[in-house]
């Protein structure tokens, strides 16, 4: 995930500093660690934020600014988005992601829960089936793409008997993220968020809660913490982008690493909008022509 970025001037030192802040060896975890090591949510979350911010800082060095852009991040990616939009510092973003990951890992250990993607089917029927099984639509990513979360036994029943014209794919997550199962992680995460110095956004920052721009730094931080137990409404973020793009002279979508999933959604939901998935420094070339 991080190997190509560490070849950039200053990147290794930056990551070393973030490793100290997070209490994790992000350099090793992002280069030579096994897949099993980095699937631990306590590791994955700060690693994802670090990867995003390394790429963004390189883009900034090349003269690009987030000002006058729209910024959004999915789930833990929202923390990185807050740093890109100037609400928190990059250092605090990594620290906050590490706390979030550690607290959520503890919550996941309380009882066996998980997540599964429900692809296709009628939305109303899918939601009704989830409710009947006491599952939560934890991520509503796009039309025909809802992520269910809850007890493992209920997810097994969903997979055995999916909604009509839908298929279920279990996800390799540690637990039922963005549901009430994460409630025990709230206090520790909230305390960490309250200790962070904030500034007003320098770019339009969309919230996972409702897809709308945050009103202020205080509003942003309140929503960020609350999002731990609430569904990610990426579908609403996409709807806001669609509305904004209709009146824009030019528009394009850039997804920072680890990239690919959100660009894939954009290609389906925002047809005709140029996109770029940034996976290595070379992908930053030519963004002016996007």
Swiss-Prot record:
EC number(s) stated in the UniProt entry for this protein: 2.3.1.39
Pathway given in the UniProt record: Lipid metabolism; fatty acid biosynthesis
InterPro entries with a match to the protein in the record: Ac_transferase_dom_sf, Acyl_transferase_dom, Acyl_Trfase/lysoPLipase, Mal-CoA-ACP_Trans/PKS_FabD, Malonyl_transacylase_ACP-bd
Catalytic activity as recorded in UniProt: holo-[ACP] + malonyl-CoA = malonyl-[ACP] + CoA
Residues the record marks as active site: 75, 178
Superkingdom classification of source: Bacteria
Stored Gene3D superfamilies: Malonyl-CoA ACP transacylase, ACP-binding, Malonyl-Coenzyme A Acyl Carrier Protein, domain 2
EC top class named in words: transferase
Keywords: Acyltransferase, Fatty acid biosynthesis, Fatty acid metabolism, Isopeptide bond, Lipid biosynthesis, Lipid metabolism, Transferase, Ubl conjugation
One GO CC term on file: cytosol
Entry protein name: Malonyl CoA-acyl carrier protein transacylase
Provenance organism: Mycolicibacterium smegmatis (strain ATCC 700084 / mc(2)155)
């Amino acid at each position: 995930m991080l190997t190509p970025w560490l070849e950039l001037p200053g990147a290794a030192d930056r990551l070393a500093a973030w490793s100290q802040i997070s209490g994790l060896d992000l350099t090793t975890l992002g280069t030579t660690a096994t897949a099993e090591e980095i699937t631990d949510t306590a590791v994955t979350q700060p690693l994802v934020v670090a990867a995003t911010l390394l790429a963004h800082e390189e883009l900034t060095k090349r003269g690009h600014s987030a000002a006058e852009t729209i910024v959004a991040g999915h789930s833990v990616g929202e923390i990185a988005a807050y740093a890109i939009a100037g609400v928190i510092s990059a250092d605090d973003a990594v620290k906050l992601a590490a706390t979030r990951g550690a607290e959520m890992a503890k919550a996941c250990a309380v009882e066996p829960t998980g997540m599964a993607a429900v692809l296709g089917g009628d939305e109303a029927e899918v939601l009704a089936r989830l409710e009947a099984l006491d599952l939560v639509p934890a991520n509503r990513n796009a039309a025909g793409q809802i992520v269910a979360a809850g007890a493992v036994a209920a997810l097994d029943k969903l997979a055995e008997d999916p909604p009509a014209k839908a298929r279920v794919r279990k996800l390799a997550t540690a637990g039922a993220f963005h549901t009430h199962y994460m409630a025990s992680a709230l206090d520790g995460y909230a305390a960490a968020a309250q200790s962070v110095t904030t500034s007003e956004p320098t770019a339009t920052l969309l919230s996972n809660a409702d897809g709308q721009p945050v009103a202020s730094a205080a509003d942003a931080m309140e929503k960020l913490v609350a999002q731990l137990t609430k569904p990610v409404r990426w579908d609403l973020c996409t709807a806001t982008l669609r509305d904004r793009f209709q009146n824009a002279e030019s528009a394009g979508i850039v997804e920072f690493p680890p990239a690919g999933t959100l660009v894939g959604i954009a290609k389906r939901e925002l047809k005709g909008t140029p996109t770029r998935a940034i996976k290595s420094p070379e992908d930053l070339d030519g963004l002016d022509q996007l």
